[in-house]
């Protein structure tokens, strides 16, 4: 058995070495047949002796048992998106904002890979968890699928604990191979490599994900505790040394003119790459300067994404279809002769509203120019009258709602036509789709098709009915099995615990967005209190205007809405605010207004728990030590951050000192 254990270790070493050479260094030293032979040997050993199978065995690359669903997990640090720039002027404005606060800076330019953002967590050098971006705060655990990507090391060459983020993508060759297989099987092909990558990583069966030949580029470190890097370029170099795959087409430049030269080059050469890119990411290189520049609520101030100009193509307008949104707005959509735009097959595009259709004189049968704004949303930008066939007529919107037949109206100050019938079937269905969405009640698995079936079969008439669904209601639906029905009912049950702001946003009250829902829920705390709120009380809140105040009061005074809320209450849907209130932040705390960095391993709490406590005291927690840092709390094995704090003369506490201070604060 000792010989067998030695052989298993040897196979691990060889397979990891050959995989790294092929998928990361792009320089294989052995043919595929040799790798496959060794992998087969290891699989056979593990099948005969399961005690030798480990979580980081190279055999996990081929996938494992199918999962029932993906667990939702909160990111330790939110995965923020980047602000966008579409031209030189916007880039120069970004540069001016940076220089105004940080002075002359060096930039790091990186290719913006068109894939799926993921976060990888390592503990003591082993890959233990991988999450999707999700909504930036909560992602889905797709660890099993990410383990099948051979460019992701299952174990690195140092016993470090940290988180690294990157973009999983499908190379062009893998995409072509996959679509060829789909076409041969009579299945619908993927529109582009990005969709194929996202779809592959959301396969519940990791064996299927393993066949999709995905790869990854890592681009950022979430926690620099165990790193020596003082810049983005040094961080990427350290990732290289640890065995991660980073994009080697990155470049440090001294100013915005260097950024523009880099963009010019890759705009001309992007098609030569073996993978898709949809822009360039520009980051301030120095980590201390990044910290000084800080963040907005949505994105870092020290980085921006330049998006390539939209590609324009000509195709034929076959028809104009109308859709009714949850607020009753009637939106015209162009039905097109399918055409490839920016790597995607497009058959539908936005026409916005009737005024724009008339202004551009767009007619059914026309040849039209379409583009994908930001390489994402297709829209019709103009018609080509010189190619117009004889007999075409100017397009006119209907006078009555296509869904319910109610007369359409145009409200004062609006260009859109709107159906104002509150019982319009199309609006009710769209309202339900909104209610279950991620930022609202977040009912996973309850998609458009299921909602449509439930509504058309008269099983549900409003969102309240969702909480009265039974397995017997669900099982007759298309593609609905026992397990799927159970998962759906569990997701509905779990949504009852959501904080009040999720319910408010989910109700689809006109003019009420995510942020305003949060502010109002925090201010008034319960739905009962909201039913008694006055317009004057609402207008006292910063950022709540006349339109929203009037809309909310009108909504809450509607007898049908009162009945709906009672219907939800009878099923124990939470109607109170569960978050930390701004008013509860201890403004008199000695931590209030201080910038604190947590580093090293804490034994009595997680760093997330420590951060939440500090933030409740009015402190701001950040990830790197700068001259603006007031305090560093250093746990076990604190690394370069502790060294830097000592160098800057920043106050440093041990975990024991921090716990003692917590007790003093809480006993005041």
Curated annotation (Swiss-Prot):
Cofactor(s) in the UniProt record: Mg(2+); Mn(2+)
Name of one Pfam family that matches: DNA_ligase_OB
GO molecular function: DNA binding; DNA ligase (NAD+) activity; metal ion binding
Residues holding NAD(+): 32-36, 81-82, 110, 133, 167, 283, 307
Residues binding Zn(2+), per UniProt: 401, 404, 419, 424
Gene3D superfamilies membership: 5' to 3' exonuclease, C-terminal subdomain, 6.20.10.30, BRCT domain, DNA ligase/mRNA capping enzyme, Helix hairpin bin, Nucleic acid-binding proteins
Superkingdom, natural source: Bacteria
Active-site residue list: 112
Enzyme superclass (EC): ligase
Limits of the BRCT domain: 586-668
PANTHER family: CHROMOSOME TRANSMISSION FIDELITY FACTOR 18, DNA LIGASE
Alphabetical list of HAMAP family matching this protein: DNA_ligase_A
Family, as annotated: Belongs to the NAD-dependent DNA ligase family. LigA subfamily.
Name by which UniProt lists this protein: DNA ligase
Record lineage: Bacteria, Bacillati, Bacillota, Bacilli, Bacillales
């Amino acid at each position: 058995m000792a010989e067998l254990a030695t052989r298993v270790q040897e196979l691990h070493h060889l397979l990891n070495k050959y995989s790294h050479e092929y998928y990361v260094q792009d320089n294989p030293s052995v043919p595929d047949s040799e790798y496959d032979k060794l992998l087969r040997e290891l699989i056979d050993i593990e099948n005969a002796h399961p005690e030798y199978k480990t979580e980081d065995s190279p055999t996990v690359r081929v996938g494992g048992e199918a999962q029932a669903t993906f667990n939702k997990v909160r990111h330790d640090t939110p995965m923020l998106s980047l602000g966008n720039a579409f031209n030189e002027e916007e880039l120069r404005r970004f540069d001016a904002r940076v220089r105004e606060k940080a002075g002359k800076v060096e930039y790091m330019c990186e290719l913006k890979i068109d894939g799926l953002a993921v976060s990888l967590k390592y503990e003591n050098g082993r890959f233990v968890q991988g999450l999707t971006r999700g909504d930036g705060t909560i992602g889905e655990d797709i660890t099993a699928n990410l383990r099948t990507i051979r460019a992701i090391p299952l174990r690195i060459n140092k016993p470090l604990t940290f988180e690294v983020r990157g973009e999983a993508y499908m190379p062009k060759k893998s995409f072509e191979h996959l679509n060829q297989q789909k076409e041969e099987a009579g299945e619908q092909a993927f529109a582009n490599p990005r969709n194929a990558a996202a779809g592959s990583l959301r396969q519940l069966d990791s064996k299927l994900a393993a066949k999709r030949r995905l790869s990854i580029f890592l681009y950022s470190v979430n926690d620099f505790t165990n790193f020596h890097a003082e810049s983005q370029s040094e961080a990427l170099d350290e990732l290289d040394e640890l065995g991660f795959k980073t994009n080697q087409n990155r470049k440090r430049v001294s100013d915005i003119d260097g950024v523009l030269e880099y963009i010019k080059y890759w705009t001309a050469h992007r098609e030569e790459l073996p993978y898709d890119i949809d822009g360039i990411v520009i980051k301030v290189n120095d980590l201390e300067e990044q910290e000084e520049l800080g963040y907005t609520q949505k994105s870092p101030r020290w980085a921006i994404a330049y998006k390539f100009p939209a590609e324009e193509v000509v195709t034929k307008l076959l028809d104009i279809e109308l859709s009714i949104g949850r607020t009753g707005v009637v939106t015209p959509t162009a039905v097109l002769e399918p055409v490839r735009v920016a790597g995607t097959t497009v058959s539908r595009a936005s026409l916005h509203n009737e005024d724009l259709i008339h202004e551009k004189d767009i007619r059914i049968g026309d040849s039209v120019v379409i583009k994908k704004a930001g390489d994402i949303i297709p829209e019709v930008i103009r018609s080509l009258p010189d190619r117009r066939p004889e007999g075409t007529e100017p397009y006119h919107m209907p006078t009555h709602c296509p869904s319910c037949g109610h007369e359409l109206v145009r409200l004062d100050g609006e260009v859109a036509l709107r159906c104002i019938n509150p019982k319009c079937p199309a609006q009710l269905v769209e309202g339900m789709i909104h209610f279950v969405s991620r930022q609202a009640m977040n009912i996973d698995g309850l998609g458009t098709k299921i909602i449509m079936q439930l509504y058309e079969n008269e099983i549900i008439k409003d969102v309240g009915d969702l909480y009265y669904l039974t397995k017997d209601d669900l099982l007759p639906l298309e593609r609905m099995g026992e397990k799927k029905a159970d998962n759906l009912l569990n997701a509905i049950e779990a949504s009852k615990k959501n904080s009040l702001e999720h319910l408010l946003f989910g109700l689809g009250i006109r003019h009420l967005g995510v942020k305003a829902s949060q502010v109002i829920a925090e201010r008034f705390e319960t739905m009962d209190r909201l039913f008694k709120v006055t317009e004057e009380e609402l207008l006292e809140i910063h950022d709540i205007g006349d339109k929203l105040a009037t809309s909310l009061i009108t909504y809450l005074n509607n007898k049908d809405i009162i009945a709906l809320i009672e219907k939800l209450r009878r099923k124990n849907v939470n109607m109170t605010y569960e978050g930390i209130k701004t008013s509860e932040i201890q403004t008199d705390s000695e931590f209030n207004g201080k910038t604190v960095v947590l580093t090293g391993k804490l034994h009595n709490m997680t760093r997330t728990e420590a951060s939440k406590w500090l933030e409740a005291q009015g402190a701001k927690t950040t990830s790197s030590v700068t001259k603006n840092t007031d305090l560093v709390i250093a746990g076990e094995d604190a690394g370069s951050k502790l060294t830097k704090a000592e160098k800057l003369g920043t106050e440093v506490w041990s975990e024991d000192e921090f716990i003692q201070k917590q007790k003093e604060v809480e006993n005041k």
